[in-house]
């Protein structure tokens, strides 16, 4: 989220200007934009057809979050970070159903509170260099992100 807000300072100004009003959509956009899970694999429990492709019970299918969260049929301007995006049917937390992430509400709350405190204490915080990324087949993450800010008085 910090990297996105640093790369799109206009979006940060929108959110910081009406933190409470924009927080619900901003949090969802951070989840869509920076989902830490790369993919999830499942086994089909029955035969299905999806977009003209037949798949049999027992076949393995993979949901690629980065692809689903940039789907042009699902999102208007999917390659734009938009803190007011609504609706935002992202695939974060598994997209719903039996495998929905039990920690989803906690994660949303952590994002909201963390950015609320950053906005309050160091509102001009911004990335100062590219992040060092975590290289993993399953997790899309940032190891370190250098940031800078003006010292509060």
Region locations from a protein language model:
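Cytochrome P450
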Residues: 1-153
